[in-house]
Amino acid sequence: MGTASSLVSPGEVIEDAYGGEGGEACEIPVEVKPKARLLRSSFRRGPRVIGASFKSTGSVELEYAAEYERLRKDYEIFRVSKNNEITSMQKKEAKLDEENKRLRAELQALQKTYQKILREKESALEAKYQAMERAATFEHDRDKVKRQFKIFRETKEKEIQDLLRAKRDLESKLQQLQAQGIQIYDPADSDSDDNHTTVTTAGTQCEYWSGGVLGSEPSMGSMMQLQQTHRGPEFAHSLIDVEGPFANVSRDDWDAAVASLLQVSPHVSQSLWSNTVRCYLIYTHETKAELQTFIQTYSLRLRRFCEGLGHFYLNVSFPEEKAAVFAAERRREMERSSVCVLLLKSSVSSCVVEDVEEAFVKTPDARPLLLYLRTADRKGEKEEVSTLSPATRDLLERVNKADRSAKLKVVDHAGSVEEGAALIFSQLERIIKQELLGLELEENGVVEEREEEDSGDVLWDLHDEQEQIEAFQQACGAAARFSFQKYVDRLNDMVAAPPPTPPLLVSGAPGSGKSLLLAKWIELQQKHSPNTLILYHFTGRPLSTSTDPVLIIKRLTVKLLQHFWSISGLSMDPSKILEEFPRWLERLSARHHGNIIIIIDSIDQIQNAERHMKWLIDPLPANVRVLVSVNVETCPQAWRLWPTLHLDPLNPREVKSVISTECVSVDIKLSKDQEKKLEKHCRSAATCNALYVSLLARLITHFSTSWTLDRTLQQCVMCQDTVSLYRLGLKVALDSLNSDQEKHIMKELLCLVCASHNGISESEVLELFPDLTFPALISMLHNLERLLIITYACGLIRFQHSQACEGVNQEFLDGDKCRGSYREKCIRFFSQQLEQDRVTWRVADELPWLLQQQEDRSKLQMSLLNLFVSQNLYKRGHFSELLAYWQFVGKDKCSMATEYFDALKEFEKTCESEQSMSRLANLYETLGRFLKDLGLLSQAVAPLQRSLEIRETALDPDHPSVAQSLHQLAGVYVHWRKFGNAEQLYKQAMEICENAYGPEHSTVARELDSLSLLYQKQNKYEQAEKLRKRSVKIRQKTARQKGHMYGFALLKRRALQLEELTLGKDSTDCAKTLNELGVLYYLQNNLDAAKLFLTRSLEMRQRVLGPDHPDCAQSLNNLAALHSERKEYESAEELYERALDIRKRALAPDHPSLAYTLKHLAMLYKRRGKLEKAVPLYELALEIREKSFGPKHPSVATALVNLAVLYCQLKQHSDALPLYERALKVYEDSLGRLHPRVGETLKNLAVLSYEEGDFEKAAELYKRAMEIKEAEPSLVCGKAPSRHSSSGDTFSMRSPALPNASR
């Protein structure tokens, strides 16, 4: 570094650049700072003389000094800058230290705060747990106090009833004493009719429960026993007045009609035997071609059609050459057949004549009949007619003569075989649709009707109901073999005990006859107490559908809801179903004018019975009784404290009677030695068991070529219990078969039944075993049924008893070790149906359950993702079962939703036709409802919107199914509390329904109720009440046409069957049936038919019982109601007056039926403007109420209000005022100051004060009335049954509002 001068050696002389003189040499101090010019001079150009001057000799040090200075200067600058940086960094460091200290302090503060919060959280959690414990304790104490209060209340009510009864007894004795001493006794005032039929005084304990169950059946009018609960008759009657359509038909008539029409009685046969359309085909060898063509070409179409509606279809035919061998089977199948088809040409065989004689001649009205007569080709038709054999001509003449009602349908065909088969199919399809299933024949009418039925908010399974009906019928039939007289008497005594009463326990060993006793008792109750509502359930094999507690309670709840205006408020949540059943029971018990009995057979077989039946331990309402039967060995300990009726083994006399009766029925006589042998054998409890003795009798009387009577008897006495006897029965049944193939099939059949969920059907058996002929199957099943091994339930082959299943398990399945292989066989069978797109209720019931039992989770998930399987389960109300399957697979709610969405998207890609798009829309709607029930509201919107879009696009924006989608979507928004969106959708749905069906259709009423509930949630009570009233009016009108009950199609068919029962001689039973038919047709708004039957009933009762019998008053009352409905008030008035006159003379002065007639006659007088004539009737009704219930009962207040209203209409305000004031005091004392009845009475008083000019008082009273209305909106506008209900779109489920006092 430096300048060029640094290169000059020391001692050299450098010429002065300025030309100065030379001088002395001197040393330049290092400190001297050379000038910049000196440094720059070394770079100047030009010739210079370099000398060894003084300046040149000091230039090196000068250059170094300059360089040094420059470096020092740079260093100083660098040093200063670095010092500055260090100072800055120190300041930053100090600042960061301060920040660090601050943050450390904050951290310490936060840690302290965190510790404090943690301690507070722990203390809060501890307080929470303590609060929960206190709440649980409080809830337990509350429930205990509630139960104690309930017991106290009901005990006091019972005491009041007893006091009233004692009072009336004393009055009766006093009258008798007066009659003896003063002779003022008038027989016309007696409580007995001309036939000396006792009518129980109102309010006695016998009015709760009929004691005379075993006596001869009295006529309906002479044994009316209407229960008088603490609410009084006015509540029930006022409900009738509001609810109409049977506003003027007396409640005892309605209850009797419902009891005999809804509850299936054994003596009335069903149109379909065990849910199967059995087509009995009679043919000759000449018409065999038509039969084969029909079976091969058209039979499958009928089967698929019936399967789609939940029924089985079966062709029943016996080959002509083997028909004589199966004579017993032919008779049996003829009785079970739903429709009979005869195919004739020219000649007939003896077997054909026998079948035709049985079906077409002896019982032509028992089933629809179809005659196919094959003539020759058209060219030779005349010649062929003349070639009919004499036997054929005679047979046709007898058939024609027997067809008095012209029900026989004839197909006369002269064309080809294929055309003939097509004609048979066409007529048979029409018969099945119209006469057997009650469907309309309009184009696409059937499908639309089914969809409309499915669109309801309550989903339930017809097959469960059918199964229970058949179980009851079979138990009734089997009970006839035993004498249960002593047990029936004891049951009557236990049931008639004063409330509160815990459930009654019927215990016994398996097979002791518990089910038979309960069925017999139910049958007697239905016969003698038509006003009693009986709900029963018979459980089947363990793990079957009939043992599912959720399905059981749901079915019973639906049966309860039949007696409300709607059945659409039922939650789908399993826990809510179990929780809400006691509430519904209590609500119905408070309004039902009669008794309620719940009977559950084999309750210990129900899955987790003790946990799911907790409601049994709570006190029951006063008019409710519960009977349950249990196996004495498996009865829970907590239930053993209940009142118990134990069934003992049969005594020797009963054993001998059962065996003797069975032997006499088949014409077998036992020798003395054989009788002694049996008597010696049947001495232990196991061998005197009712089922054991019954099976023993069947085995002894069983016909078999390889088993003699002695051999059978010898083998039987070696069996010491029922299961071993069943195993012997299986061996006997096997040995009775002809071939090894049939024996193998029978083993396989029984093993498949054992492995299945609910059993298998006959048509499924024929599919599983193609080599098996129908006659061989029927013969095999007949033998097994006679040996008490199998039975039929809803078209399925099942075991009659659990011991039979255990016998098969031990004999054929090696103690359950081989059951898995048979389940796999069932899985393959139903999976094959699934692959063929045959998704029936059977596939949905069996396949998922079988896969679950086999623990095949992957295949189970695949079956559930078949959208039609899940849809079938969901739409039949098996929501809990569907959830259980998904839980078994290991999926939560969100995963289920995702899986279904993906499956639906895949299915949507394959949809092209209009029909497939309609099915897709149904699937989306089902998924939306399913997700809504799961509580996934946000995810439920998308499928419902997609369903709406598809229906609007594929069908029509104004199609009724679009309204259904709108309704369901609005329901989700209601749950979501998006009321504005919901209101818009409900209104749009209502507009579509009004355009499609008219303004008075049930779907319009549904939308009105939904809107009413919506307005109620928004506190718009006036709008809600207005819509609710409009809905009630619509339902009153449509109820006449739909019968109010969900089983209306069944009622319609029952009406035809009841008509057949009225064709016999005059009798009280026949007259009773005629009256019930009249009531039924009245409810259907078929007033002409109703008048015909009611008139016939009246005339028959007058002939049989006399014109002054109470039953005649009943018929007169109903005829009066009919004339009143037709606006024929003059005739109605005359009939009511005649009925009142009879009941005044025949019944007690305070009998409810008398009060009923008084009330309706008074209402008729008011309607006709005859107010003066109505006054004494209302006064008499008031007097009856006061005598029956005392002056402080709410029903007395209602009578006071009605009389006061009448006085107001007569402008007798001074007479009306004290009645209103007295009624107001009674209402306030008995119902509370905020009850709606108090508000209604205050409103009436306000109107009265206003009319008298006392405006200030009127304003005050009206203000109080409005305060009550606002305080109790749920009582005015209706209230949903549960805030946890899964359906926010449902309307009010409460009883209809009580009528205003101004009524």
Swiss-Prot record:
Keywords annotated in UniProt: Cell projection, Cilium, Coiled coil, Repeat, TPR repeat, Wnt signaling pathway
Its GO biological process terms? cilium assembly; convergent extension; determination of left/right symmetry; heart jogging; kidney development; Kupffer's vesicle development; left/right pattern formation; pronephros development
UniProt-annotated stretches for the region Disordered: 1276-1303
Where does the UniProt annotation locate this protein?
Cell projection, Cilium
> Which portions of this protein are annotated as coiled-coil regions?
81-183
Species whose genome carries this gene: Danio rerio (Zebrafish)
List residue spans for each TPR repeat.
449-482, 802-840, 921-954, 963-996, 1005-1038, 1071-1104, 1113-1146, 1155-1188, 1197-1230, 1239-1272
Disulphide bonds annotated for this chain are none
Tell me the protein's name: Nephrocystin-3
Q: What happens when the gene is disrupted?
A: Morpholino knockdown of the protein in the embryo causes ventral body curvature, pronephric cyst formation and laterality defects, including reversed heart looping.
Chain's role: Required for normal ciliary development and function. Inhibits disheveled-1-induced canonical Wnt-signaling activity and may also play a role in the control of non-canonical Wnt signaling that regulates planar cell polarity. Probably acts as a molecular switch between different Wnt signaling pathways. Required for proper convergent extension cell movements.
Q: Name one GO cellular component term.
A: ciliary base
One Pfam entry for this protein is NPHP3
Compositionally biased tracts (Polar residues): 1283-1293
